[in-house]
């Protein structure tokens, strides 16, 4: 039997009263070897939808590209933006269709539509769970303990951003295969935007 190798990543999603925040650390690792500290695990799909992921970078990028193309196609055909649940369901079908050789990625889908903000959690086979907050990846247990203690249903978008950064930092401090800086995707009625938080590690 070979030695188990972990693909490190930590991603967090928080639904606020006025939007959604997705966050992920930037380290790309193979086991305890760091390949890069500039990995992208947060992706803007359109101005109302974003995803964050934990797993293999290539699979994350492929899923983001597939979803972006399908959103563009829908908007051209129907002349309106798809709902968050509809795009999550589409991604679920795509992931389940690969169940014999699945994408090695857990996904957070976050966005805003006519019904308000949504956060949907997906496993590698495409199971869907809508929730108020979630954490994925090797640092998930560390991050979600902070979310459990701090989250409120009436949390504002600015408070959610701060909490997401704190949760990722908590994972980075203890999880040896998470690290680098933090990428954020913030989605509200004004659109979707990316932000970066640099972290200085003290050794």
UniProtKB/Swiss-Prot annotation:
Its EC number is 3.4.25.1. GO terms for molecular function: threonine-type endopeptidase activity. Residues 1-9 form a propeptide. Gene3D superfamilies: Glutamine Phosphoribosylpyrophosphate, subunit 1, domain 1 (3.60.20.10). HAMAP family: Proteasome_B_A. It is found in: Cytoplasm. The formation of the proteasomal ATPase PAN-20S proteasome complex, via the docking of the C-termini of PAN into the intersubunit pockets in the alpha-rings, triggers opening of the gate for substrate entry. Interconversion between the open-gate and close-gate conformations leads to a dynamic regulation of the 20S proteasome proteolysis activity. Component of the proteasome core, a large protease complex with broad specificity involved in protein degradation. Coiled coil: none annotated. It comes from Pyrobaculum islandicum (strain DSM 4184 / JCM 9189 / GEO3). The 20S proteasome core is composed of 14 alpha and 14 beta subunits that assemble into four stacked heptameric rings, resulting in a barrel-shaped structure. The two inner rings, each composed of seven catalytic beta subunits, are sandwiched by two outer rings, each composed of seven alpha subunits. The catalytic chamber with the active sites is on the inside of the barrel. Has a gated structure, the ends of the cylinder being occluded by the N-termini of the alpha-subunits. Is capped at one or both ends by the proteasome regulatory ATPase, PAN. This is Proteasome subunit beta 1. Keywords: Autocatalytic cleavage, Cytoplasm, Hydrolase, Protease, Proteasome, Threonine protease, Zymogen. It holds the Pfam family Proteasome. Belongs to the peptidase T1B family. GO terms for biological process: proteasomal protein catabolic process. GO terms for cellular component: cytoplasm; proteasome core complex, beta-subunit complex. InterPro entries: Ntn_hydrolases_N (IPR029055), Pept_T1A_Psome_bsu_arc (IPR019983), Pept_T1A_subB (IPR000243), Proteasome_bsu_CS (IPR016050), Proteasome_sua/b (IPR001353), Proteasome_suB-type (IPR023333). It catalyses: Cleavage of peptide bonds with very broad specificity.
């Amino acid at each position: 039997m070979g030695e188990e190798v972990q693909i490190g990543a930590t991603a967090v999603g928080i639904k606020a009263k006025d939007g959604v925040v997705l966050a992920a650390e930037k380290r790309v690792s193979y086991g305890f070897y760091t390949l890069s500290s500039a990995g992208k695990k947060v992706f803007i799909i359109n101005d109302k939808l974003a995803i964050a992921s934990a797993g293999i970078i290539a699979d994350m990028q492929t899923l983001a590209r597939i979803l972006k193309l399908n959103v563009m196609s829908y908007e051209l055909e129907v002349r309106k933006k798809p709902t968050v649940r509809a795009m999550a369901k589409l991604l679920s079908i795509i992931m389940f269709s690969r169940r014999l050789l699945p994408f090695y990625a857990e996904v957070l889908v976050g966005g805003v539509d006519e019904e308000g903000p949504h956060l949907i959690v997906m496993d590698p086979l495409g199971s869907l769970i809508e929730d108020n907050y979630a954490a994925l990846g090797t640092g998930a247990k560390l991050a979600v303990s902070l979310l459990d203690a701090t989250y409120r249903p009436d949390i504002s978008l600015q408070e959610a951003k701060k909490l997401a950064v704190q949760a990722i930092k908590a994972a980075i401090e203890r999880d040896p295969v998470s690290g680098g800086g933090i990428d954020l995707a913030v989605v509200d009625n004004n659109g979707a935007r990316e932000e970066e938080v640099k972290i200085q590690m003290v050794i």
